[in-house]
Amino acid sequence: SLSHRFAQNGLAPEFAFKIWSPFLEQLDSHVVEMWKAGQWKDFCGMLPEYASKGHGEGFMHDTAMMLGALGWSEYDGKADIVTPYFGASGTGQINAVFPVTPVTGRDIPKAVASGADGYTPVSRRI
């Protein structure tokens, strides 16, 4: 899942195969191009804001976990797009393969969501 703004009640049939807004569709399109080009440092830097403003499902936790497993901004692979971007109930969807490449793990951020050292904003927990 990319942007995840579901169609409001009563509008679901109209948005069964559409994206909720042109803005989100353009945002997602740019993100897919970043993935295809392997621009992970830039993408990881914008992920918290993308998750918020793009209505990311679960604050893009699935994407964050996948990138953590791949090496975060150190990852140098390029996404192989399996199916073109498509809309489903207002949300942006895609199927892509992210090849595993060797990394050191040096760029993976420390987990802070479970830390008891004090408050941190949600945007810093990814």
Question: Model-predicted segments: where are they?
Answer:
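Catalytic metal-binding/acid-base residues of hydrolase active sites
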Residues: 3
